[in-house]
């Protein structure tokens, strides 16, 4: 039975991966470590609470003693690191938190894995072990009107968030190059789907449209992103973890490039038609001052993972956005719990003066 340490399991992508993996593998053990910061919510894991294949541990990936004790207790086969502060606006306001969680947390996980998996006397690594770092296409910087990010594209991050993720990626690769640690890195495009914290574009717009709130759109809204349905991403991570060549980076993209303003207008149209609400219209859109250092376009070339592992994005955007809207409409109580308290304060601070 394979044993995984999953960090950031109560967040958006991490919780979707937990659901995906438990559904796919009848014999597996997931030890899920999450600090439960603002974006980590145990309600995301409510459906698997009683599953004996799932063990939840509340804690910080920076906690050396805790992580050490988990390796000693469970002898993990795989570590998949989803844990990260991930919102660019928050990183601009408070970059130190991103360095601590995204860089120092990653280094702590690498160190503890090295101690547990490397036999210093034999100078060999235990068989069947792997560390997988879940990263982002933002580490590459911005693209022009044409072309795509390749795995060989130089790292050129532009925000404190993407800089912290690029730093973490470089530490992961350094542990491979220096010590021979068995690692992979995946770099994905913009994810969307169930359980996403509503500071991100799609759930934010769905929630605001429903309540006739203004829809803040940065600049002209023509920033282009490649949209990847989260279940497709989970499948890619699973395939890389179990079949990826050690030491390799794999780009994971959706082949769904869309401008942000198109996303917003699509959500307006979908909810107007479904809810039969004339208060839902493009009049809700409010263009606000553009984000500092806002990259204009991202685009991923996933040819390598397709050729090496047979992965491809199965969910076109037109289908994925319908599935996503359906999920949020069916989980209003989840959204109400998420958007109470500290979130409201944060939302006002981010957008009230723009």
Predicted regions and their residues:
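Amphipathic alpha-helical recognition patches that constitute DNA-binding helices
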Residues: 8, 12, 130, 159, ...
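N-terminal Rossmann-like NAD(P)+-binding domain of SDR-like oxidoreductases, especially those catalyzing
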Residues: 1-191, 241, 323, 328-331, ...
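Short histidine/acidic/glycine/proline-rich micro-motifs that form metal-
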Residues: 36, 190-193, 223-224, 291-292
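The catalytic Tyr-centered alpha-helix of NAD(P)H-dependent dehydrogenases
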Residues: 146, 157-164, 194, 198, ...
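Residue-level recognition of oxygen-bearing side chains
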Residues: 66, 97, 104, 197-201, ...
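C-terminal substrate-binding subdomain of Rossmann-fold SDR/epimerase-dehydratase oxidoreductases
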Residues: 3-4, 17, 30, 59, ...
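Short aromatic-enriched loop/helix-cap "lid" or pocket-rim segments at secondary-structure transitions
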Residues: 42-45, 143-146, 196-199, 263-265, ...
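Residue-level signature of the cytosolic catalytic core of signaling kinases
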Residues: 41, 50, 145, 194-198, ...
């Amino acid at each position: 039975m394979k044993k995984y340490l999953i960090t950031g399991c109560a967040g958006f992508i991490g919780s979707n991966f937990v659901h995906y993996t438990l559904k796919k593998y009848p014999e597996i053990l997931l030890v899920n470590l999450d600090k439960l910061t603002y974006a980590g919510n145990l309600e995301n894991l409510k459906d698997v609470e009683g599953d004996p294949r799932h063990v939840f541990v509340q804690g910080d990936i920076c906690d050396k003693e805790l992580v050490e004790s988990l390796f000693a207790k469970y002898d993990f086969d795989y570590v998949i690191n989803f844990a990260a502060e991930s919102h660019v606006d928050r990183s601009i306001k408070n970059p130190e938190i991103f360095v601590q969680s995204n860089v120092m947390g990653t280094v702590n996980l690498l160190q503890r894995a090295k101690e547990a998996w490397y036999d210093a006397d034999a100078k060999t690594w235990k068989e069947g072990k792997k560390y997988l770092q879940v990263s982002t296409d933002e580490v590459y910087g911005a693209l022009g009107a044409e072309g795509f990010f390749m795995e060989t594209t130089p790292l050129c991050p532009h925000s404190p968030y993407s800089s912290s993720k690029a730093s973490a990626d470089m530490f992961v690769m350094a542990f491979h190059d220096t010590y021979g640690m068995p690692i992979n890195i995946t770099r994905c495009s913009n994810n969307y789907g169930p359980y996403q914290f509503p500071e991100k574009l799609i759930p934010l717009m769905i929630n605001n449209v429903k309540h006739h709130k203004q829809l803040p759109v940065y600049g002209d809204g023509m920033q282009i992103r490649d949209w990847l349905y989260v279940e497709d991403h989970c499948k890619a991570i699973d395939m890389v973890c179990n079949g990826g060549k050690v030491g390799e980076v794999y780009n994971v993209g959706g082949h769904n490039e869309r401008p942000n303003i198109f996303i917003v207008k699509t959500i307006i149209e979908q909810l107007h038609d479904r809810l039969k609400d004339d208060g839902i219209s493009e009049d809700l859109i409010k263009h606000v001052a553009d984000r500092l250092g806002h990259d204009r376009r991202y685009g991923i070339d996933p040819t390598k993972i397709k050729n090496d592992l047979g992965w491809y994005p199965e969910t076109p955007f037109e289908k994925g956005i319908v599935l996503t809207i359906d999920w949020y409409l069916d989980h209003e109580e989840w959204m109400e719990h998420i958007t109470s308290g500290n979130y409201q304060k944060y939302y006002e601070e981010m957008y009230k003066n723009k």
